[in-house]
Amino acid sequence: MELRYLRYFVAVAEARNFTRAAHDLGISQPPLSQQIQRLEREIGTPLLRRLTRGVELTEAGESFYVDACQILALSDAALEKTKGIARGMNGSLVPGITSSAAFHSQIFSLLYQFQQRYPAVALRQVEGNMATLMHALGEAELDIAFVRLPCESSKAFNLRIIAEEPMVIALHRSHPLSGESALSLAQLSDAVPVIFPPEVAPGLYEQVYDGCRRAGVDMSRARQSSQISSSISMVDAGFGFALVPQSMTCICLPNVTWHPLQDASLKTEIAIAWRRFERSRTVKRFLEMF
């Protein structure tokens, strides 16, 4: 059954007159009457009762009218939705966010701006470590990913840097240097470092590990946390000190003091990664924002 038959029938049912319906549809009356008769033959029962001055719906016609309106509405909505997806105006966007960057305000600011500009696009964020995100992006389970650089596995994708931030030191309030402002890692050579696992952010892990080692910190004494954020909780509990990205200073714990790092060379970048030869208009719309 063709959709145009349904449109013709609905037009006649609402106009209660073949002549007016034909005028509304922009066709002549004889072809319209023929199409309605063909529809009735296909269904196997009359839908309209022909009167002297128009038509009225039969009982079957009343039921069919309700269903026809729903089918046409769904068809029109599906068509508009598909057109919108092709234009990147609706559909969905699944961004991955590495847990080490989840506290950086610019990421969610960008996502919010995109949602405001394209409210019909459904956003579903996925948080994970770098290895998980890079695999998911390669398997098209994610559309984009916010990653920490440097990252060897991200080199297979297009990258665009969106932020750079320095590293800072988290100390327990009881530490003798907690009242100081900027600190060097060499001043903490006798302290116990708290460090996250390498799979969380491999490049950042190497930076932190090598930076501490070069400053004389004994990394064999290091305590390992499950995530960067949990390393701050371990500092709060008294396990040692942590070297983390500046955006993590938004985590306020009662026993943690924050200190800028004197070595300005220790810094990290956040980038957006997406697949090469990406065809999604929604992804392209997002990238057009900056």
From Swiss-Prot:
Highest taxon of the lineage: Bacteria
Keyword Transcription part of the UniProt annotation: yes
CDD domains: PBP2_BudR
Keywords assigned: DNA-binding, Transcription, Transcription regulation
Ranges for domain HTH lysR-type: 1-58
Recorded GO CC terms: protein-DNA complex
InterPro entries: BudR_PBP2, LysR_subst-bd, Tscrpt_reg_HTH_LysR, WH-like_DNA-bd_sf, WH_DNA-bd_sf
Record flagged with keyword Transcription regulation: yes
Location of the DNA-binding region in this protein: 18-37
Gene3D superfamilies linked: Periplasmic binding protein-like II, Winged helix-like DNA-binding domain superfamily/Winged helix DNA-binding domain
Pfam families on file: HTH_1, LysR_substrate
SUPFAM superfamilies: Periplasmic binding protein-like II, Winged helix' DNA-binding domain
GO molecular function, one term: DNA binding
Family the UniProt entry places it in: Belongs to the LysR transcriptional regulatory family.
Function field: Regulator of the budABC operon for 2,3-butanediol synthesis.
PANTHER family: SMALL NEUTRAL PROTEASE REGULATORY PROTEIN, TRANSCRIPTIONAL DUAL REGULATOR HCAR-RELATED
Record protein name field: HTH-type transcriptional regulator BudR
